[in-house]
Swiss-Prot record:
The lineage of its organism: Eukaryota, Fungi, Dikarya, Ascomycota, Pezizomycotina. It comes from the Eukaryota. It is found in: Cell membrane. It comes from Gibberella zeae (strain ATCC MYA-4620 / CBS 123657 / FGSC 9075 / NRRL 31084 / PH-1). The keyword Transmembrane applies. This is Chitin synthase 5.
Length: 1864
């Protein structure tokens, strides 16, 4: 039969033919079809048809709603509406589910056509629900669409949009609901935006569309512009140019907000959504740096790596951190800590990794991805809850399937996203091929209809290889992820599966040869290749396993668990977050994943009976049964969600595979009619109206369009109608004869339909959709223009708003926006998703005010709420009286600082923190008071006792004679010393009259005679006036200091130049006064000085009338000897005035005469003169008779001041001398004899690297001490991977010691130091023998692993807790107290495995993990203990291994050396070394004679294990200097014992090499020193005598520590004094300074430590740092702690209540039992067979934590701890022999498998041990014991329980053996 396909294109050229199958056969090739598409494209016909249910659409990159004539006809929009009309028609008339599937590459316009299609479908509904469904689609696109290199609207999530209809009552379906199913959002884009692309559009909407007030609240206001742009670069928004790409983000945000509001999201929720989006942007802005954690935490005792702080990663921009924390409802500190750590499961162990900045950046990215994924899931699920109809009411659905296009290369670098995306496209393409080629093949065959075969490219190999359940690629990836396999193991699994078995998948090599190498190494670029239908793609395997697991670390979940934000709690509480809980503590979330599949399954057809009159056929029944099966699977999926934590979890690939399977079943279901829309892009450059034939031809070839077209030319069947149904649709009443088949053939012959559209089968007719519409009389609805469309129902005129008025953008019409297009798509006035909704906009108008956060909590309030902790009362106590007195003193000293200021300005909300700050201020005030007192005694006290005098004796004056080498040129005039040298240049009248040489001859002399005075001008006499003729002779002093009266003839010849008295021709009465005024104020250097003895001598021997009045010396000798005369001008007669020359009062003259040579101040004060006369006399004395001041520089008072300071200096110097003598310990290091004492060697380990740990362990092991008598004890503080390490510290230690990973002992409970519930910790015990360089040393490793509920840093409690583990154990051993389960295991391991009774150990040798000890160190220390039984502890000399590491380490070398060899050696003289460093010390555990516990005595253990550390003093004692405090406790409670320093015992440690760590370490040391010395001073037991008691030395040390800054300032002051006044050299001070370092130099010279010369110079240069900068910094940062969450509040009646957010610890939660009781029970439960001993079930379970209660009484869920011995195991480098005969019967060698931390997929859903045991018993009852095997029993159990039991294999085997042997 010739094919005559209808020519519906109308008249015209070839381009008028829209149907490709209608083209001639010779035009059915790829090339010809492409040419045909091009011809249509160039005349603005961008669409073509393959059949009635397949459309081809070319993206024009212009308006997709305009056809060739400018109208809608012929456009892509019209084509989409045509498909919508057809689907709606079949939905109503046949009650079939409809599916519209989109295919096409990215940029082909799928999103645009989908928008038009959805609009057309929704326009057919008259309910307001259509608006909501349209808005839901917009919200989905906003959240999942981005701009890529190929399109501005690239969808990055698979969409299954289901419209739900009720078709039971009418042929016009009623829209009753909708459902959005998202498939695998491209999460990698969130934190890694590809270059030239954008992140998801909603993030740009937020930045551009918020108002200024909203931006301020969200923290987005940094440099924002008016047009929605910003100068600030946002990491998660890509390059700043992506903010301006022609998309109107601002309008998009308004539409997004309004869409949410119309979807009934409350205003508060919309605001919360915006806050989460903003927090994601801010997370991208976080900057990280490596720093040292110098603030000690509440749980951390510090102490590791010399207490310099742990290297951590911190956030640099704390302001951004606070914004994120506020929006998430958590504290900033918690968020920073969480981002710096990451908890993982490694080898079934929960381990915390300390991240570097890059790791922290990635962790922050994980948080951002998690937040966005959960937000999208929550929004979509919320929409679904409000739009989805009940399942029972849904009759049929229309489903739109649109997945991202095929991805040849992944822009984000995520191989997983690329693989899953391409897997989806592969699956969709395959179901497309099935629909066209295979779907009806079986039915055609059964109906005996033959159709010509058509060859086509079949991608079934690729589909099976990728998607086959069980052994497809995605299934293998999921399985390998569940099994914690590596990437290379995954690659090998693929090789085993696909090599030679599937041509579509090729697996690369896991090994490769590097260039220039002949050896195979791991191939870092290993990959596998998949031959997709669209091309080959190489997928790298590196990181694929980890990416597939998509694990959200427990750290983030633990942090979010404490959120104060209800919205954030809801996000993390939804079903999309699949949590993995601990097998024993269901409340403990170990980790989680965000689901990669939809939270809902596709809906199914309602089970209601079909409408009356509708035929019910076998086909319909088959369809119904298939849908029921799908419904059951859907219900199972819903049920599985509720029990997610009880079933093994899938990885991303497994979940995605399951969702694809659901989708494929829904689309390919027999009751579903599918339409396909092929979207093609005309060119790769997004150029409008340009057709690239090569580009299009490649797409035509890829999608097999030519083969599909050829297939449709032979078979285009869309329906099968049984003859009865077919005839019922036709007008066949006129045909009265013939069978149904004959009548049907007659109808078909009459219609003259082409053969490819209709065929008659055995029981019915196959029809195309066109033929069905014609026969059903629906063809009249076909619109003009030749398209199968416009089939609007009779309800089309329902008054709905037409699509042209719906505001959703030309987006979906114009994919390349040519300007500032609104939204992300286009103009508001064009067609799209939205229809008008006439409901009130009142709810939306709430946003009109420009601030959606108005009346909501501010960011500050959120931050404050996030920082609040949920506290619980844990303890109640009263303050001690001493504490009360101290608090009173603190408030007395800081009363002027209001509490409000401390709280607001200092931002200290907690009262205990404010109190600590006040204490710090008070302590600083006291310190500065002491410094001020010290400074006063050094400088102020001498000046107060002996004020400085600027006086010169005659001899001193003569030394200033101006000669070469002299100090200057001074002269004296009437008692005033003048600087002649400076005056000479200003001498008038200059050198012409008197030369400078002549003037310099006066230097060093008294030149009073050169300056005659006018008496009347300087003195008023008795009556107020003296005749001007009165003159007075002058007196000089010679250079020998002897006074001499000069006769008139001895008057200096130059005096005439200064003689302006009345009797001269040039009389100037005031000339002398004016000249002296200038001298005194410009050139004065001091005054002449006369000692009291010298004054007395002058009066006695020379008959001088000289006295001292108030420190001034006056001489009236000349006056009293008649030295006054009258001198008139030449030619004038001398007047006769009686008494003119006696102008002084007689009483004054008499005073000089009667008391000459004496101090007459008292007489002067009591002289009987009126005040006026006395004032006149005093003026006359000062002007005429003053010759100098009284010189008291050598007085008794001044001598006392000088010698008082000297005495103190000598006292301090004597201490230095004693220190020097103490350091002079000469003689060789005598090698002690071999000793037989047992010693424990303890190493606390935290995050040290392997080299440091190995050096420390090896140095202890290689010590020259009997190996059998030393025990290595390594305490690992938590499961933490330090920065730079690849394994957790415990694993590093165990690897060093040779412990195999298969050894996995049970974690056991013990008491720890921590807040609240952290006092309950758990640990594992390992033991064995360590062999190194011929030494075989027993060891015990204690690993603190933490409780199952601990997520972050499990087990970590600090160094002090590590010490307490051993101290508390030994304390209970020696006092025979009840022990915790872990301590019982320690006892067992030491006694029964190592073979030594724990009580035998006498000494505890403690070093740090970065310390290396000398081979003879322990021997020398123990020898000292044996020699002196009163010695309780000692330390050795610690040097530096990294001395030349940096300048910071260099300045410490000499300080380390001298602090040991001076300070500690001196303290050792008194037997009271006040600080035994924890890095290298040995302690006596018990007294040698009596066995009395010493180091582990009750008092020391109780005080050292103090948990309530809530005051500044206690924090400085226990958190800063626990080593020093431990020494303080030894001196306090064992005062009769000694602590010593042994210089012969040596060790080497690592000093801080960075300034921050060094500063932190010294802050710890200085502050702990101050607080510990305060503790020591009151002790009465400190030994000594007189001043040289230890108490005095302690006080001196305390004082010197405090006043160090003043000492440095004093040295600077001395240097200044010497520099400013070279004549004054403080010889004593410099002698003392010289003695200090001179004696030190003698020490290292005598010891031939020549290198110390250089180190000492560097140390001296750094004195300002050590003695000034560090103390000041330390004192002020005394309260620099992380105060934790425990605080103290005021209670009733003066009581204090301790509250904590860690919960209240119940001591009874840790069972305890004495060793004897435990041992007896152990004997009872052990068989009498001679086997090796292990822990009993009683020890392991009865005394383990109560959390294990739900498990079986028999062996629980954990395995007992295994001994380290190789007996029965054979592990290398482990126990090969027992050190002593075991006292216990043998070892059952850990029969019962398991571990503390099972991998989640193995443990959840497992049967209990009781159930397994019962079934094993039942199996063995009926089994043939001669043939039964363990494997067979396991298989039978798996069959019975229907779960794999690999994780229980060990238990099954051991239980089987126990039952067979009769043990059970």
């Amino acid at each position: 039969m010739a094919m005559s396909l209808p020519q519906l294109g109308g008249a015209g050229g070839a381009h008028t033919q829209p149907s490709l199958p209608s083209l001639p056969a010779h035009l059915q090739s790829d090339t010809h079809l492409t040419a045909h598409l091009a011809s249509r494209f160039h005349v603005s016909h961008p669409t073509a048809r393959l059949s009635s249910h397949a459309l081809i659409s070319l993206n024009t990159y212009t308006n997709s709603s305009k056809g060739p004539d400018g109208g809608k006809e012929g456009s892509a929009m019209a084509g989409a509406e045509d498909i919508a009309d057809r689907a709606f028609l079949r939905l109503g008339h046949r009650s079939e589910n409809q599916a519209i599937v989109f295919l096409g590459e990215s940029g082909a316009g799928k999103s645009t056509i989908r928008a038009h299609l959805l609009t057309a479908l929704l326009n057919k509904s008259s309910t307001p629900l259509s608006t909501k469904l349209s808005l839901a689609a917009y919200v989905f696109d906003s959240l999942t669409t981005t701009k890529t290199a190929t399109t501005p609207t690239a969808s990055k999530s698979g969409l299954f949009y289901e419209l739900q209809y009720d078709t039971s009552a009418t042929t016009n379906p009623i829209l009753i609901g909708g459902k959005l199913l998202d498939h695998r959002l491209e999460r990698s884009r969130i934190a890694d935006v590809p270059t030239g692309e954008r992140n998801f559009h909603v993030l740009y909407y937020l930045l551009a569309g918020t108002s200024e007030a909203e931006k301020s609240h969200l923290g987005l206001d940094g440099g924002s512009g008016a047009a929605g742009t910003t100068q600030k670069r946002w990491k998660y928004l890509g390059h700043p140019t992506q903010l301006k790409v022609g998309i109107n983000d601002a309008e998009g945000f308004q539409v997004f907000k309004n869409a949410l509001r119309k979807l009934e999201f409350p205003r508060a929720e919309i605001a919360e959504i915006c806050q989460i989006l903003a927090s994601i942007l801010h997370i991208g802005q976080l900057e990280f740096e490596t720093t040292s954690q110098t603030s000690v935490t509440g749980d951390d005792s510090g102490g590791f790596s010399h207490e310099g702080g742990t290297t951590v990663t911190a956030v640099k921009n704390k302001d951004v951190l606070s914004i994120v924390a506020a929006f998430l409802g958590v504290s900033s500190a918690d968020l920073q800590t969480t981002l710096g750590y990451k908890t993982k499961m490694i080898h079934r162990e929960r381990v915390t990794v300390m991240l570097d900045p890059n790791g922290a950046r990635a962790h922050a990215g994980e948080l951002a991805r998690t937040l966005y994924s959960l937000l999208v899931a929550w929004i979509l699920e919320t929409i679904n809850q409000r739009l989805c109809a009940p399942e029972e009411s849904i009759a049929n659905t229309v489903s739109i399937v649109d997945f991202p296009g095929f991805c040849q290369q992944t822009p984000t670098g995520s191989a997983l996203d690329q693989l899953l995306n391409n897997a989806a496209t592969e699956s969709i393409y395959n179901l497309t091929l099935q629909n066209f080629f295979d779907r009806k093949a079986d039915m055609l065959e059964s109906e005996e209809v033959s159709v010509a075969a058509t060859s086509y490219f079949d991608n079934s190999d690729a589909v099976r290889g990728i998607l086959k359940p069980g052994n497809g690629l995605l299934s293998i990836l999921d399985d390998q992820t569940r099994r914690n396999r590596t990437d290379m193991q995954f690659l090998e699994a693929l090789r085993r599966r696909f090599d030679g078995k599937n041509a579509a998948i090729e697996v690369g090599s896991a090994q490769a040869k590097l260039p220039g190498s002949n050896f195979l190494t791991e191939n870092t670029s290993a990959c596998f290749t998949v031959k997709h239908f669209a091309g080959e793609v190489d997928y790298p395997v590196k990181g694929l396993i980890e990416e597939n697991s998509e694990v959200i670390s427990g750290d983030l979940l633990n942090m979010i668990n404490g959120t104060k934000s209800e919205f954030v709690a809801r996000l993390f509480g939804q079903d999309a977050l699949q949590t993995v809980t601990h097998p024993t503590e269901r409340t403990t979330v170990m980790q989680a994943t965000v689901s990669s599949k939809p939270m809902r399954a596709p809906s199914v057809m309602s089970r209601k009976t079909t409408r009356a009159g509708r035929p019910s056929t076998a086909h319909r029944r088959q369809q119904q049964e298939a849908l029921e099966e799908l419904d059951r699977e859907s219900q199972v999926g819903e049920s599985n969600k509720k029990n997610a934590n009880m079933t093994p979890e899938q990885g991303a690939s497994g979940q995605f595979l399951a969702s694809l399977d659901n989708l494929q079943k829904a689309v390919t279901d027999p009751g579903t009619n599918s339409y396909f829309i092929f979207c093609l892009k005309p060119n790769d450059r997004r150029i409008a109206n340009q057709f690239d034939s090569k580009c299009v031809r490649m797409q035509v070839q890829t999608f097999g369009i030519a083969e599909i077209s050829q297939r449709l030319r032979s078979a285009d069947f869309s329906l099968f109608l049984p003859f009865g149904e077919f005839l019922g649709l036709t007008d066949s009443e006129t045909i009265l004869v013939g069978s149904e088949r004959e009548r049907a053939e007659m109808v078909i012959e009459e219609k003259q339909w082409p053969q490819n559209e209709v065929r008659v089968g055995a029981t019915g007719v196959f029809l195309s959709e066109r033929c069905w519409m014609e026969i059903a009389q629906l063809g009249e609805a076909v619109s003009v223009g030749g398209r199968y469309g416009g089939l609007h129902s009779s309800d089309a005129g329902d008054g709905l708003t037409p699509a042209e008025s719906i505001p959703y953008g030309v987006s979906k019409e114009n994919l390349v926006s040519g300007g500032n297009t609104p939204l992300m798509y286009g103009e508001k006035s064009k067609g799209g998703y939205f229809t008008d909704d006439n409901r009130s906009e009142a709810g939306v108008s709430a946003f009109g005010g420009g601030d959606m956060f108005k009346n909501l909590d501010t960011r500050e309030q959120m931050a404050e709420r996030g920082n609040e902790k949920s506290l619980e009362e844990v303890e109640e106590y009263r303050d001690k009286p001493s504490r009360k007195r101290w608090v009173a003193l603190v408030y007395f000293l800081t009363w002027f600082i209001p509490d409000f200021a401390v709280r607001v300005i200092g931002r200290m909300s907690r009262k205990d923190v404010r109190m600590a700050w006040r204490e710090k201020v008070a302590i600083n005030m006291l310190i500065w008071l002491m410094c001020a007192v010290a400074a006063f005694f050094m400088v102020g006290f001498p000046m107060l006792i002996c004020p400085k005098q600027y006086v010169y004796s005659s001899g001193e004056l003569s030394s200033y004679d101006g000669e070469k080498g002299s100090k200057g040129a001074y002269v004296a005039i009437r008692g005033f010393v003048i600087d002649l040298e400076n005056f000479i240049p200003n001498h008038y009248p200059g050198s012409d009259l008197v030369s400078e040489t002549t003037l310099m001859k006066y230097a060093g002399k008294d030149i009073t005679s050169l300056f005659p005075v006018q008496v009347s001008a300087l003195c008023q006499g008795k009556d107020g006036a003296i005749p001007p003729e009165v003159t007075l002779d002058n007196r000089n002093t010679n250079m020998t200091g002897q006074p001499q009266l000069l006769a008139q003839r001895d008057v200096d010849v130059n005096s005439v130049y200064h003689d302006f008295r009345y009797g001269t021709n040039d009389s100037r009465p005031d000339w002398y006064f004016e000249q002296m005024y200038t001298f005194k104020h410009v050139y004065l250097k001091g005054r002449m000085g006369y000692t009291p003895k010298y004054v007395e001598k002058l009066a006695r021997d020379s008959a001088w009338n000289i006295v001292t009045i108030h420190g001034k010396v006056y001489d009236m000798t000349k006056y009293m000897q008649g030295g006054l005369r009258m001198k008139t001008k030449p030619g004038e007669a001398t007047p006769n005035i009686p008494g003119a020359t006696d102008f002084m009062e007689d009483s004054v003259v008499q005073l000089f005469r009667s008391a000459k040579g004496q101090d007459v101040s008292k007489y002067w004060d009591n002289i009987k003169l009126s005040a006026v006369k006395k004032q006149r006399m005093e003026t006359c004395l000062n002007n005429l008779f003053y010759i100098g001041d009284s010189d008291t520089r050598n007085s008794t008072r001044c001598q006392f001041a000088e010698y008082f300071i000297l005495a103190i200096s000598v006292l301090l110097a004597s201490i230095l001398v004693f220190k020097f003598l103490a350091a002079l310990q000469f003689g060789g290091k005598n090698v002690p004899e071999n000793l037989d004492k047992f010693v424990m060697c303890m190493i606390p380990a935290y995050t040290e690297d392997e080299d440091s740990l190995r050096r420390a362990i090896d140095s202890l092991s290689r010590m020259k001490y009997d190996d059998k008598r030393k025990l290595l004890v390594v305490v690992c503080d938590g499961m933490i991977i330090g920065q730079g390490n690849d394994r957790p510290t415990p694993r590093i230690v165990l690897d060093i010691l040779g412990v195999s990973e298969t050894v996995d002992p049970e974690p056991l409970s013990f008491e720890a130091l921590g807040e609240g519930m952290k006092q309950h910790n758990m640990g594992k015990i390992y033991s064995g023998l360590y062999e190194v360089q011929g030494h075989i040393v027993p060891f015990m490793v204690i690993v603190k692993v933490g409780k199952p509920s601990e997520v972050a840093r499990p087990g970590n409690r600090g160094k002090r807790d590590s010490q307490m583990v051993l101290m508390r154990f030994l304390n209970r051993v020696h006092y025979n107290l009840a022990m915790s389960p872990m301590e019982l295991e320690m006892y067992h391991q030491i006694r029964n495995i190592i073979g030594v009774n724990p009580t035998f150990y006498e000494y505890l040798f403690q070093i740090d993990a970065d310390t290396v000890v000398a081979p003879d160190s322990a021997t020398r220390m123990i020898s000292a203990f044996i020699d002196d039984t009163r010695l309780i502890a000692c330390c050795g000399e610690t040097a530096l291994t990294n001395a030349k590491g940096s300048f910071i380490t260099m300045i410490q070398v000499y300080e380390y050396w001298i602090s040991h060899n001076l300070s500690k050696a001196f303290e050792s003289l008194f037997g009271s070394v006040t600080c035994l460093p924890g890095c290298f010390s040995m302690y006596r555990i018990r007294a040698a004679e009596t066995g009395k516990p010493l180091f582990v005595s009750k008092e020391i253990v109780e005080d050292y294990s103090t948990i309530r550390v809530d005051t500044l003093h206690m924090k400085n004692l226990l958190h800063l200097g626990e080593d020093r405090y431990l020494t303080t406790l030894l001196l306090k409670y064992h005062g009769k014992y000694k602590t010593k320093y042994l210089y012969s015992a040596q060790a080497w440690t690592i000093a801080p090499d960075s300034w921050a760590v060094f500063l932190s370490q010294r802050r710890r040391w200085i502050n702990s020193t101050v607080h510990n010395l305060v503790e020591l001073i009151p002790l009465a037991e400190l030994c000594g005598f007189c001043c040289f008691s230890m108490r005095f030395v302690v006080f001196v040390d305390l004082l010197s520590t405090i006043v160090q800054p003043v000492i440095v300032m004093y040295i600077v002051y001395l240097i200044y004094q010497v520099a400013s006044n070279p004549s004054v050299v403080p010889i004593t001070a410099f002698l003392l300074l010289g003695a200090i370092y001179g004696l030190q130099a003698i020490i290292f010279i005598l010891r031939r430590k020549w290198e110390m010369v250089g180190w000492m110079i560097m140390y001296i240069a750094a004195i300002p740092v050590f003695s000034f900068g560090l103390p000041l910094y330390s004192f002020w940062h005394m309260d620099d702690f992380n105060w934790g969450n425990t605080r103290v509040i005021a209670g009733e009646s003066g009581k204090k209540i301790v509250v904590s957010d860690e919960g209240k610890f119940d001591p009874n939660s840790i069972p305890r039992k004495k060793w004897e009781e435990y041992q007896a029970e152990l004997w009872e439960t052990q068989t009498q067979t001679a086997r090796d001993d292990v822990r009993s079930e009683i020890s392991g379970y009865s005394y383990a934590t109560k959390a294990q209660g739900p498990f079986s009484d028999y062996h629980g869920g954990y395995q007992p701890s295994r001994p380290g011995s190789t007996a029965g195991f054979g592990h290398p480098n482990m126990s090969r022999m027992s050190l002593a005969h075991s006292e216990m019967p043998g070892n059952r060698a850990s029969q019962f498998g398991g571990s503390q931390f099972f991998s989640p997929e193995e443990m959840v859903g497992m049967p209990s041990d009781d159930a397994l045991l019962a079934e094993i018993r039942d199996i063995l009852k009926t089994a043939d014991l001669m043939t039964v095997t363990k494997k067979g029993i396991k298989q039978e159990l798996e069959r019975r329980f229907n779960v794999p039991l690999d994780a229980k294999r060990a238990y099954i085997n051991s239980a089987t053996e126990a039952l067979l042997s009769g043990q059970l």
